[in-house]
Amino acid sequence: TAKTVFTVQYILPAGAIAVLALAAMYIDGYGLRWQSLEYKSSLAAFRDQTRPAYLFDYVCQRQRVSAADIQNEHCVLGEKGIARPKVILWGDSNAAHYVGVIDAIAREAGFSFRNMELGSCPPLLTDPESFVNAKRLPDCLASAGFIREAVMAADIIIISASWSDYLRRSDKFLDVFFATTQSLSDAGKQV
């Protein structure tokens, strides 16, 4: 019958192809190539390059900054052999995304910089309470003095943060942030 022919010629082959496609998707296409050492090494290199920024040892993103962190030589990138970096990258975890690109620029331009990122804490020189989650506030406050010391030791300050997150918490964020940048500028810093 026509129904049997349709089933045998179309439905069964389409179903078999769908099952094979789903199986290939389920095993992520590994199949025989998983036995290849070249494939495994390429996959490991790819995974290493696509790790989150905070997993790289030269990205100094912390949940709480300590005195040791602001002295950590792994946090200084760019041109080697410069005793005291005059530039600092300061911000929350969003700033960590720029470490690699600023490192490349610094090497080419011949300067070094320190990077200091404090997860979920805005780059402010004042109390961040209105702009952070209550769970993060103790870490933000405990880190503030160390971060201030590192920021004030620099001549040039690059600031990055997840601005929209802090603005969602309070419409006063920009006023407080601009007061911080003005304070830094008044202290002779380039922001």
For each feature predicted by the language model, list its residue ranges.
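Extracellular/periplasmic envelope-modification machinery, especially enzymes
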Residues: 1-191
